Swiss-Prot record:
Alphabetically ordered keywords of this record: Carbohydrate metabolism, Flavoprotein, FMN, Monooxygenase, Oxidoreductase
Biological process according to GO: alkanesulfonate catabolic process
Record's function text: Part of the sulfoquinovose monooxygenase (sulfo-SMO) pathway, a D-sulfoquinovose degradation pathway that enables the complete utilization of all carbons within sulfoquinovose (SQ) with concomitant production of inorganic sulfite. Catalyzes the oxidative desulfurization of sulfoquinovose to sulfite and 6-dehydro-D-glucose. Is highly specific for sulfoquinovose and cannot use sulfoquinovosyl glycerol. FMNH(2) is provided by the FMN reductase SmoA.
GO-annotated molecular function: alkanesulfonate monooxygenase activity
Entry's family note: Belongs to the SsuD family.
E.C. code: 1.14.14.181
Protein name (database record): Sulfoquinovose monooxygenase
Keyword Lipoprotein: no
Induction statement: Induced during growth on sulfoquinovose.
Bilayer-crossing regions: none
Subunit structure: Homodimer.
Record region (Disordered): 366-385
Amino acid sequence: MTVVPVTSADLDAAEVSWFSALCSDDYAYLGVPDGSLRSSFEHCSDIVKKAEELGFRNILCPSSYQVGQDTLSFVAGCAPISDRINFLAAIRCGEMQPIMLARTVATLDHMLKGRLTLNVISSDFPGEVADSAFRYKRSHEVVEILRQAWTRDTIDHDGEIYQFKGVSTEPARPYQLNGGPLLYFGGYSPDALELCGAQCDVYLMWPETKDQLADRMRAAHERAAAHGRTLDYGLRVHMVVRDTEQEAREYADHLVSKLDDEYGQLIRNRAHDSGSLGVSHQARARELADKFGYVEPNLWTGIGRARSGCGAALVGSTDQVLSALEEYQKMGIRAFILSGYPHLDEAEHFGTKVLPQMKTCSLPHAYGRVPSETPATPLGNGERH
């Protein structure tokens, strides 16, 4: 039985996703920059192509002001070089005027023929620090405007930050039906949980102990239930999977064998989410870990020494990692966003050892969002005015 009621209660599969390192986050040794792994379009798109080839169903494309790829530009560039994998594009609310963002999303959704999902983020913009309550209020309004653009004939919004009346939604109609692209969201503060509970579809969590994850799920469900809604749940976690546990643990140690902790701190501080509540929870997990960095069997926190955000990895044999993922599924987790270093190599390890043993799905298809043929939208097969 799941920890809390979930939207896709009858779904017997999981959306298994990989990660494209758009934000200067690919290493052979954590904290040791390698020019061959820089976040160029060529390298990041190679990760996308490898993930699609291996059978991953979605790929997270993050957003940060770092040397690398602009998220939406990158996703657009990948549209013609992919045909099966979905894209989970991060959108930092407030970067773009909301109605123009809705139009941009609609363009991408048509380019990808419904293979678009969105990761709603609310972190600071480069060079400025905004009050958390304001950032989440802004995100709440942006998401509300997006949802109107995708489901109504006009946008009518009278908020504290944005005001629009009677704006036609024709230019912003997405390829996907029944609500538009799915919204994935992660956050731990009361304002974050309220936004997710009221507006989003999938609540994303970073790796902690199973008891802590269950508490996160209960907190998110409480806010969703207050709005008469349910959520699906996702876990973002790194991977180190090998034929044996010993090999996996040795490789985990190898990853951090050249790490200078001061430089690791510098890397963490570069990220826009470095001061967030979620990041503090990841730091706490490192403090509670044993002398080898494990906070729970096979859950290793060493990644977080040189990375903000998601700071732990499942480390183990094929069977151990598969069993851990199955336990998460029993809790009610329906989406896994995975990564590993270097991203091409670890995708191959997971994609050949574990992924073939999992029943996977595309959540937009499971939700009935993706039409079987080009929809009657203004940008699709609808009447042109």
